[in-house]
Amino acid sequence: MEDDSLYLGGEWQFNHFSKLTSSRPDAAFAEIQRTSLPEKSPLSCETRVDLCDDLAPVARQLAPREKLPLSSRRPAAVGAGLQNMGNTCYVNASLQCLTYTPPLANYMLSREHSQTCHRHKGCMLCTMQAHITRALHNPGHVIQPSQALAAGFHRGKQEDAHEFLMFTVDAMKKACLPGHKQVDHHSKDTTLIHQIFGGYWRSQIKCLHCHGISDTFDPYLDIALDIQAAQSVQQALEQLVKPEELNGENAYHCGVCLQRAPASKTLTLHTSAKVLILVLKRFSDVTGNKIAKNVQYPECLDMQPYMSQPNTGPLVYVLYAVLVHAGWSCHNGHYFSYVKAQEGQWYKMDDAEVTASSITSVLSQQAYVLFYIQKSEWERHSESVSRGREPRALGAEDTDRRATQGELKRDHPCLQAPELDEHLVERATQESTLDHWKFLQEQNKTKPEFNVRKVEGTLPPDVLVIHQSKYKCGMKNHHPEQQSSLLNLSSTTPTHQESMNTGTLASLRGRARRSKGKNKHSKRALLVCQ
């Protein structure tokens, strides 16, 4: 439902031409640095992020890639179900998908962040670490998600699962920044969260008159796919990267020949993420009605055809989680998910219900959000488990209470979340609220010069334009009405019928606004006058 995502990365734009002019940028281009386009090399899992380091200098590496856990710390079996606290199926479905994201789960189970975090209270990384640890090390049980996970977002009604997912990812990314308040915007794209979920778009315009080429690079955390004319994910991706001809009224104003001329424009993935979040745009921007069509998606997806360098060998991703919406409209329905445990077995995670499933069932769903991981990453994590490198449960009691074929034991009370400090919830609400998150997105729409369906403005040749983020760290004052509508923790386990929630999702105004972007997630303020 939303194709925008908040994040704090930078954007770079290059112009390189067969005929270079010696025009000097005027005073308005205060952030422009002259540079030459870096020589490209074949992309690999190890070099894709490095290419972005060449695009602009990075003053500080916030999370060196070598710090990412390489071996799996996850238990092989499936973990706990999540109690529905009242219209929170969207929270549960999203949390389960994040919990079974191998690089994220391994980092959380390593406890590396909490050992060095100076915030603790109000830190989304610490909160997610506690949740993932409890969920994975309490198989056969039902646990209550912490209030702090949805503080500032949940308002007593059902919301958009994708919005909550990216709200949480953004909060985790911001949690990587305390202590690095003055870092440049390019360094902020080196956070652990960006290394897991992030990559870079490349928007290229080629003037057909003088053959000048303009490249714009912009970060992403997820990819939204238009499915109205697509029967499969591959078709939607092909449509996304299909070259567009700019002519007539849409002719390109070239910065070299200084005239409006025909041009071709192409959007491709310049660097790939370790984990791909693909969002299928299933809801009408006007009516909110659901596009209830079957869109095929594969268990293994080769992303190489959609990269800037398509001839460097396969880039295979494997499916490990699927988020599903059941219903006919964005105004009601129910969310649940399918996840692939480390052992390779698929499970349906429907609030408290955890049942074994099959890949056939998984691939037959009307998916809303698809989660893919690079095949090499998945195999490395799976291999470490098969070799017995799985550590003892961190802080969890020894138990052999395992779910048989995914069936949960109902003869025990739900595991309660630790009593929360009121200051924790208050601070979390102050720092990140749903209204403020949507406000930021409204203020940071996709720039015309990057939108694949719009014509870019004129830029001087042979320049590097550094676009700083418009997102501010400061948040709104605490809203008592939102505080009062936080999760109502109950000790009772809901029935399946009770968990079939109906509620109003995000406003249609937000949906219409979000559709204007072309599958991009960082909304940059252009610090130069065009």
Curated annotation (Swiss-Prot):
Q: Which CDD domains match?
A: Peptidase_C19E
Pfam family for this entry, one: UCH
The USP domain extends over: 80-375
- Subcellular localization: Nucleus; Endoplasmic reticulum
Q: Which InterPro entries does the record cross-reference, listed alphabetically?
A: HABP4_PAIRBP1-bd, Papain-like_cys_pep_sf, Peptidase_C19, Peptidase_C19_UCH, USP_CS, USP_dom
Q: Could you confirm whether the keyword Nucleus appears in this record?
A: yes
| Record field: compositional bias (Basic residues) | 510-524
Q: Which GO terms describe its biological process?
A: protein deubiquitination; proteolysis; regulation of apoptotic process; regulation of protein stability
* Entry's EC annotation: 3.4.19.12
Return the Basic and acidic residues bias intervals: 382-392, 398-413
Q: What reactions does this protein catalyze?
A: Thiol-dependent hydrolysis of ester, thioester, amide, peptide and isopeptide bonds formed by the C-terminal Gly of ubiquitin (a 76-residue protein attached to proteins as an intracellular targeting signal)
GO MF terms listed in the record are:
cysteine-type deubiquitinase activity
Functionally, this protein is described as follows:
Deubiquitinating enzyme that removes conjugated ubiquitin from specific proteins to regulate different cellular processes that may include cell proliferation, progression through the cell cycle, apoptosis, cell migration, and the cellular response to viral infection.
- Output the PANTHER family linked to this UniProt entry: INACTIVE UBIQUITIN CARBOXYL-TERMINAL HYDROLASE 17-LIKE PROTEIN 4-RELATED, UBIQUITIN CARBOXYL-TERMINAL HYDROLASE
Q: Which family does it belong to?
A: Belongs to the peptidase C19 family. USP17 subfamily.
Q: In its UniProt entry, what is this protein called?
A: Ubiquitin carboxyl-terminal hydrolase 17-like protein 20
Tell me the gene name. Answer: USP17L20
